[in-house]
């Protein structure tokens, strides 16, 4: 695996020498704007692999994306390669529909230590929940970013990530009640502890998430990519673009329903993805918002 190929894939041409917050932020932003958060393998009849060589081939060489276990594993490798002190952590994702955090550790995120300060770096949550900058690991501090205001809080060794969102304007009235829309201004995202993990800790859940009928990842096909102003999402046959803070503390959310040919065209034109196998778009009943 070639670190230069990774940086070429994300379009990063800046310094790799300074192991500071500015460099970490720059790399994170390049990755989330180049590498989609997506689960299309599942809906093309292919596996979501955890092996780093396979992930590198999929994302860097074949210009695909991946889900958190893949894109954050790749980010962990890249940051470690250039000298950042990086630790894999495990997260428990909040389900709004059930009003609770997952019982299984289904999310992979990173802790990066710079000059004695700890930061959370996560390139694998996508949609309008995706951080654009690393979050300083300080309990109770509001950390405003372009997508929203993020906050980390700690209680008896467990950390919680939440966000305060803007109002949203949906010009296409047909989608005002879409099940893809986040309805809450305040939103819990996930919890985690600071216990170091390895990729092996995620092997069983990686299998479960792509095989179980109860998994949102088998219920819905999705692809999400950040832009300098917002985020594109394709869920099943529905394409959305959210422009953050387009006016008066309000996000603009545009919806469009695509046919199969348009899905293929938009995957290529918006997400830079050309699939090798046929995609079966799916919008099942499991809770998933953009």
UniProtKB/Swiss-Prot annotation:
Residues with the modification N-acetylmethionine, per the entry, are 1
Q: What is this protein called?
A: Arylamine N-acetyltransferase 1
- Intracellular or extracellular location(s): Cytoplasm
InterPro entries, per database record: Arylamine_N-AcTrfase, Arylamine_NAT_domain_sf, Papain-like_cys_pep_sf
Q: According to its UniProt entry, what is the function of this protein?
A: Participates in the detoxification of a plethora of hydrazine and arylamine drugs.
Enzyme class, one word? transferase
Which controlled-vocabulary keywords does the entry list?
Answer: Acetylation, Acyltransferase, Cytoplasm, Transferase
Q: Which gene encodes it?
A: NAT1
Q: Which family does it belong to?
A: Belongs to the arylamine N-acetyltransferase family.
The UniProt record lists the keyword Cytoplasm: yes
* Annotated positions binding substrate: 106-107
Which GO molecular function terms does the record list? Answer: arylamine N-acetyltransferase activity
Going by the entry's taxonomy, the superkingdom of the source organism is recorded as: Eukaryota
> What EC number(s) would the UniProt record show?
2.3.1.5
Concerning Pfam families, the annotation shows: Acetyltransf_2 (PF00797)
Q: Which SUPFAM superfamilies match?
A: Cysteine proteinases (SSF54001)
**Catalytic function, reaction form:** an arylamine + acetyl-CoA = an N-acetylarylamine + CoA
Q: Where does CoA bind?
A: 103, 208
């Amino acid at each position: 695996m070639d670190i230069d190929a990774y940086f070429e894939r994300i379009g990063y041409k800046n310094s790799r020498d300074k192991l500071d917050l500015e460099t970490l932020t720059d790399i994170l932003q390049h990755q989330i704007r180049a590498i989609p958060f997506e689960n299309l393998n599942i809906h093309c009849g292919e596996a979501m692999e955890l092996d780093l060589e396979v992930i590198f081939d999929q994302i860097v060489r074949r210009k695909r994306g991946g889900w958190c276990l893949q894109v954050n594993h790749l980010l962990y490798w890249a940051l470690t390669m250039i000298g950042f002190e990086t630790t894999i952590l495990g997260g428990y994702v909040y389900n709004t529909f059930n009003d609770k955090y997952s019982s299984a550790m289904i999310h992979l995120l990173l802790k990066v230590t710079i000059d004695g300060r700890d930061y959370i770096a996560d390139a694998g949550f996508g949609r309008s929940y995706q951080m654009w900058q690393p979050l300083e690991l300080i309990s109770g501090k509001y950390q405003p970013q372009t997508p929203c205001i993020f906050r980390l809080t700690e209680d008896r060794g467990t950390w919680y990530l939440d966000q305060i969102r803007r109002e949203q304007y949906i010009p296409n009235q047909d989608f005002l009640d879409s099940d893809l829309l986040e309805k809450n201004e305040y939103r819990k995202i996930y919890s985690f502890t600071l216990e170091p993990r390895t990729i092996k800790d995620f092997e069983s859940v990686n299998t479960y998430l792509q095989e179980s009928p109860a998994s949102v990842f088998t219920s819905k096909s999705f692809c999400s990519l950040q832009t300098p102003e917002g985020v594109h999402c394709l869920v099943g046959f529905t394409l959305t673009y959210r422009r953050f803070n387009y006016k008066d503390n309000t996000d603009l959310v545009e919806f469009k329903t695509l046919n199969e040919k348009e899905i293929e065209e938009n995957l290529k034109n918006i997400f830079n993805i050309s699939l090798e196998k046929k995609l079966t778009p799916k919008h099942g009943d499991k809770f998933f918002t953009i």
